């Protein structure tokens, strides 16, 4: 039961964080392109790559924290369904450039951010001697 509560707490924090960051992004950059979804997905990819290399790469002694941060927080913070819906919406409105740009940006930048996060996590882990 404790794991479910940790998962729910992480998920609640992730969802609220995504909502807040998306609203801030719309205020700052407008809504002509789904920047909010792109930013949360890239940030989530970076954090997951970092955490999996730095703190959770092997048999972590803190599986509860891993569950709360990865499946809970990052699972709710990032969003494949919103990305897919926003892309389809672009296509339905005839905005093929933004639709394809959204696909390329989320996939390529997501992969790049996981790589960068994992690389930095690995460097930090090596430098800390753990």
Curated annotation (Swiss-Prot):
Gene encoding the protein = fluC
Carries keyword Transport? Answer: yes
Q: What is the lineage of its organism?
A: Bacteria, Bacillati, Chloroflexota, Dehalococcoidia, Dehalococcoidales
Under the heading PANTHER family, the entry gives: FLUORIDE EXPORT PROTEIN 1-RELATED
The cellular location(s) given in this protein's UniProt record come to:
Cell membrane
- Cellular component terms (Gene Ontology): plasma membrane
Mostly located where?
A: membrane
Recorded hits in NCBIfam families, A to Z, give: crcB
Q: Name one GO biological process term.
A: cellular detoxification of fluoride
Q: What is the purpose of this protein?
A: Fluoride-specific ion channel. Important for reducing fluoride concentration in the cell, thus reducing its toxicity.
Q: What is the similarity comment for this entry? A: Belongs to the fluoride channel Fluc/FEX (TC 1.A.43) family.
Q: Which GO terms describe its molecular function?
A: fluoride channel activity; metal ion binding
- Please tell me the species this chain comes from: Dehalococcoides mccartyi (strain ATCC BAA-2100 / JCM 16839 / KCTC 5957 / BAV1)
Question: In its UniProt entry, what is this protein called?
Answer: Fluoride-specific ion channel FluC
Superkingdom in the source lineage: Bacteria
């Amino acid at each position: 039961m404790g794991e479910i509560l940790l998962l729910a707490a992480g998920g609640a924090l992730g969802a609220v964080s995504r909502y807040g960051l998306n609203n801030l992004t719309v205020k700052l950059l407008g809504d002509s392109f789904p920047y909010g979804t792109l930013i949360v997905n890239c940030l989530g990819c970076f954090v997951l790559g970092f955490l999996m290399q730095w703190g959770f790469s092997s048999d972590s002694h803190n599986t509860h924290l891993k569950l709360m941060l990865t499946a809970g927080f990052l699972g709710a913070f990032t969003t494949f369904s919103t990305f897919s819906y926003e892309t389809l919406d672009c296509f339905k409105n005839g905005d093929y450039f933004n639709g394809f740009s959204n696909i390329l940006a989320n996939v390529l930048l997501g992969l790049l951010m996981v790589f960068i996060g994992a690389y930095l996590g690995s460097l930090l882990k090596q430098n800390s001697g753990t």
